[in-house]
Amino acid sequence: MEEVGVVAKISDNGMTVQASKVLEDVKLGDSIAVNGTCLTAVSFTKGEFSVDLSPETMRRTSLGKLSEGSLVNLERALLASDRMGGHIVQGHVDGTGRIMSIKTDRDSIIFRVRVPKRLNKYIVEKGFIAVDGISLTVVQRGASSFTLAVIPYTRENTNLSAVSIGDRVNLEADILAKYVESLLER
């Protein structure tokens, strides 16, 4: 996650996002993840870029719930020469979860997220999960939810600073877990 942008405009099939860092070397057709959803920059200016949103993207992600002024997490595609500071996040959202509770534990913020049953099997304690494109570690897994402990730096430098109980968030399960499942099913 490189920066927090602001949704400037929404249309029936796309949106425009205000940004700066992710636009430093952008070219038409480049991938920019918005809340963990890999999207294609179809136009850009010095301070904003536009993307198209397919019906599948609208069904599978929480992007359809955004409004003008919404804060969104932004990240360019990883280069082979970059450091990987988390786990592999592809920008291929598996589904959405819903924020069930937000509590504090000393300096950390504890989020409980309801997860769709079909995704819960990929979630393991101390394993990875991408929430709105943020690589995070699962603290605890329940029958239909999981918890995350978010440090102040992460909350203040992502859209988690604006998340409320009931909000939908994009979830991407660990790709390695999905590959293992696919291999075992053969």
Report each predicted region and the residues it spans.
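Conserved loop->alpha-helix
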Residues: 1-186
